[in-house]
Amino acid sequence: MKKYSLDKFKENRKNKEMKKLTIITTIAISVLILLALYMANSSFRSFIDTYILRKEISEENANSIIIDTEKASLIYAYDKNLVVYSDGNLNFYDVTAKQVANIEITLSRPIADSEKKYLVLGDYGSQKICLLKDNELVWQKDVDGKVSKISVNREGYVAVSVTGTTYESIVMVYNPKGDLQFSKYISQYVLGIDISEDHKYLAIAEMDNTKISPTTKIELVSMELATSNSEKATVNSYQASTNEYLSGIKFQNKKNLICCFDSYILKLNEKENKKIYELSENTAYTDINMLSGFIHVDKETSSVFKSDYRLKINSNDEKAKEKVYIIEGNIKDIKSKDEKIALHLGTKVEFVGKNGWLDKKYKSSQEIKDVVLSNEIGAMIHKNKIDIIEL
């Protein structure tokens, strides 16, 4: 009797374990099938994104700012805010399209840059620059010369490049309080400037136009050394070949400067300069405005898919596998900020994360003029309104 009970108990336990294993296996297979369908079938993916994951947002369901965008000389997204400059007023809106702040300031041709809670504004071709934090003015001043480029890091350090002096260009760096740290005199036109997040380095991209074929040079400057002697503070530099076009520079991971040329991506730091990616002739768009890595859109010459374009997300680590996102439709533009990517597809915008997965999709009945984004919000600009969504 005892033996029978023990055998029966073992058999029942074995059956329960088999049932549990069968259930787990069935769930795992179902998940894999659903995942495969989601990846391969656009209709199924659209259904899941729209009705299950609620990723798709129509213009009727977006928060809107009713405004004549033709009269706005600046529309810019930073942190959780949208900034609109018009008629001497800098207006700030949150993700619900509610105006949360206003600053009166005179800017003829405003340009902007931001990192985290800091926003720097400059009056291109004029003298005014100002720093804002959390929608409040921290400092403003007029500089000698004409503002051409501005940059701010996440700690509030500001770099500004000016022209129109006895030098071709002057780059000035200010601390978060607005105190001038140093000036560096440049004999060439400045294409771009950036400050590392720990404010140890300043990067300056220069273009020599004095020859028949222009050349680009990138300098890495120690900000500590520059405070005592800015002319002897360059710790590394890179000289590009003739006719290599530079589209942008961006500090990533504190010490690494990522430089985007028309045919390759370069990594520059104090110890080395190295080409980390060769772009192909099929590359239509590139962008390096990420926390880490870079993105590019390639046109596929032959494909079993309907789409002709692929978004490819790359790490700065050459050994890491790139992530691929299939683009359906004709792409108008691509933008990135930190960990978010915006694909402008005419009447819709797809927001993709750094993992290569769709975060949000916005659909409109009319052509979208432009898209601006931060790591927190995306804004679609129409002629008579701006639609805002949270990312």
Question: What is each model feature region?
Answer:
Residues 191-308:
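Acidic, serine/threonine- and glycine-rich low-complexity intrinsically disordered segments
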Residues 20-39:
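Hydrophobic membrane-insertion alpha-helices, especially the h-region
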Residues 66-76, 105-117, 145-154, 186-197, ...:
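Repeated scaffold domains used in trafficking and secretory/extracellular systems
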Residues 106-208, 212:
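Non-cytosolic head/periplasmic domains of membrane-anchored proteins
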Residues 53-67, 96-104, 135-142, 178-184, ...:
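A short beta-strand motif characteristic of beta-propeller blades
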Residues 40-46, 89-91, 127-131, 166-172, ...:
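Structural motif
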Residues 81-82, 119, 157-159, 199-202, ...:
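Hydrophobic beta-strand positions that form the internal "hydrophobic ladder"
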